[in-house]
Every structure is written in structure tokens, then in C-alpha cells.
Amino acid sequence: MQKQNIVILGSTGSIGKSTLSVIENNPQKYHAFALVGGKNVEAMFEQCIKFRPHFAALDDVNAAKILREKLIAHHIPTKVLAGRRAICELAAHPDADQIMASIVGAAGLLPTLSAVKAGKRVLLANKESLVTCGQLFIDAVKNYGSKLLPVDSEHNAIFQSLPPEAQEKIGFCPLSELGVSKIILTGSGGPFRYTPLEQFTNITPEQAVAHPNWSMGKKISVDSATMMNKGLEYIEARWLFNASAEEMEVIIHPQSIIHSMVRYVDGSVIAQMGNPDMRTPIAETMAYPHRTFAGVEPLDFFKIKELTFIEPDFNRYPNLKLAIDAFAAGQYATTAMNAANEIAVQAFLDRQISFMDIAKINSKTIERISPYTIQNIDDVLEIDAQAREIAKTLIRE
């Protein structure tokens, strides 16, 4: 078997590092062909020394220059590229077999679309591609003959729980024809699911980033605490699985053992279970339709004391309700909400606003954006930019 060339968009982030771990566990199957990051020179330098990619790219031009000099000094032949255009070109490189799209935020949008337009096999971990582009993105996957495989643990669980006919029709699944009655999206509820609501005003960034089950970056950890993460995943699931609002259900499952479920019309429920480790869905997508070793500890059923399920409380998780309503309002609303949330979460981490302010800023930003039918990627970027400015203004007020 010839080694698969993997391009990792966001190699210095949490998903990127987990992807490199899977590659390290399967050196005979995969090669880290190109590594892409933002401006973290040290992390990228260490990855280049260990994995010897053909290419490394950083979005920050000055950081790329420093990286290039360090690699030359250590006689590492990796070619260093810089800037957004170079990253998009790597995402579409003719020698790339699979693209791990894991750049967090709207910054990952254009490189991911480049991979899709090159007809690549895209392992999708970037939520924003679907949250902001939705129909545009799904249509591009179909029109350019790209293969889309969901990496998010919940969407990957749903994917694994669906019949092969649905797996081959991502974005256009005829759920009712296949006997699917509900897609059940599970979430841990974050670290504050039992915290009294009156204490929410005192929540600190340190408390918010301490997720009880998953190891994640700061932004995603805060999103998990507000359940915006689940809201974004709800939007993603609607697009990925062509699901109506009536075909969706969100439940809180504190143990994070069941990663999501599919309910069928005959009364069956198929669930995907496993230890909360992102290497499992990453390995599943990389090897699909086969399986490969991920380095993950097998689930020990004797250590699982209980599996519990709770109905989400929208008073506790206003961001979840906001995301559900934003999907119903249209693509402009989900794009604005996503942009505002990125700004609001960073402001919270920088101690400029309170934990409770995040949802308020997101909601007010959507209210201030005029309803608009998105026609193309330029429309998406325009609304994204508008929403960011509105959110920044709201933070200053």
C-alpha cells in the first residue's frame, strides 16, 4: 500500500496534534506531507524536525521567515511558505491525498474551500465552513467531486451510525427514505452544568477552559461551557446530514461516552461509543472505509458506573437556543453569530466581558445585521467582517 500524503491545516492546534499522533502510530500508511499553522514558530519547528514534511506554511509572514531560518540552520529540507494564498495552494496540492481541515474559526474557510474545489478528500474539523457557508459549501463538495468526511466526534459518531448509502451522500442524505427518524446530538454540558445560575456572573476564564472530559483549545473549551459548541454542531449536522429541525434532537450526556446516536423508525437506536479521544474519529476518517490503529485506550465497560442523559436548559445555555434559531433565520444569521462569538469569547478570555455577556453580544450582533440572502463567498466574508465590528463596538459600550 502506498503511503497517503496528508496535509494538516492547523497542525499546531489540538486536532492537528492528534492527527500527527495517528500518523506517528501508522508510519507505513501515512506521511505528513504539509503542515500549516498560524504564527507558532516553535511548535511548527518541532513538528518539522519530527515529521519532516515536504512543506510547512505559516499564515504570519514574519513567523514563516523565522521558521525558514531555523530549519536551514538545522539542515531540515522542508520548504517554508507564507500567507493565506500559499496555504490555499497547499490545500489543493496535486500530491495531497487527504486534507485535514482543522484551522479554528473563519480563518479556515478559504483553505478548506480550496481543498474542496480541487476535488480532495477533506477530513472536516473546521466547523465554520458549514456554519458560515452551508449550502455554498455542500454544493461545492458535490460540484467539484470532493469527498467529505466529518471529524468532529459527534458528527463522526452520527456518520458511523448511518447506513452506507447515507455515508456516500453527505449533504444530500435522504434520511426518511433510509428509515432515520432522529439524529441525536449529545454534549457533555461543559463544566457548569450543575453550577447554580446565580453564580454564572462570577465564572472566570480559568474555570471555563477546564473541560471535564475532553482536552481542547481555549476557544473551543469556552464554546463547550456556553454550549455554543453544540449550537455550531447542530448547524453542521443540519447541513451534513440534510436534516430538518424535526429530525434533530440535542441531549446532554455528562460522561461523553456516547458521542451521538441515530434513531430509526423501527424503534432501534444506534450509538457510537468510545473514550473521549479525538484520535478515534480522526483515525476513522483517515482510514475510511477501513479501520486503523489510533493509539486510543479501549473503552472499559466495567469502569463506566452510569450513562446519564439530561434535557438542555436554554436559560443555562442561551447560546444553544441562539444557534438553533439562527439556522432557522438563515445563513446570514449563523455567519454573524459565529463571527460575534469568536470576538466575544476572546474578549472573555481577555477579561473584558463576563461569561454571561458572551451570549448577549452574540444575540445583539445578529439583531443589528440586516437579513440578507448569501449568494457567494464574498457575501459570507462581508457579513463576517460586519459582525466582528458590531461585536467589538458592543464590547466597548
Swiss-Prot record:
Pfam families given in the database record: DXP_redisom_C (PF08436), DXP_reductoisom (PF02670), DXPR_C (PF13288)
GO molecular function (one): NADPH binding
Residues bound to NADPH: 12-15, 38-40, 126, 128, 217
Keyword Transcription regulation belongs to the record: no
Pathway the protein contributes to: Isoprenoid biosynthesis; isopentenyl diphosphate biosynthesis via DXP pathway; isopentenyl diphosphate from 1-deoxy-D-xylulose 5-phosphate: step 1/6
EC number: 1.1.1.267
Residues given in the record as Mn(2+) binding sites: 152, 154, 233
Catalysed reactions, as listed in the record: 2-C-methyl-D-erythritol 4-phosphate + NADP(+) = 1-deoxy-D-xylulose 5-phosphate + NADPH + H(+)
EC top class named in words: oxidoreductase
Named cofactor requirement(s): Mg(2+); Mn(2+)
Keyword Metal-binding: yes
Function: Catalyzes the NADPH-dependent rearrangement and reduction of 1-deoxy-D-xylulose-5-phosphate (DXP) to 2-C-methyl-D-erythritol 4-phosphate (MEP).
Designated name of the protein: 1-deoxy-D-xylulose 5-phosphate reductoisomerase
Originating organism: Haemophilus influenzae (strain 86-028NP)
Phylogenetic classification of the source organism: Bacteria, Pseudomonadati, Pseudomonadota, Gammaproteobacteria, Pasteurellales
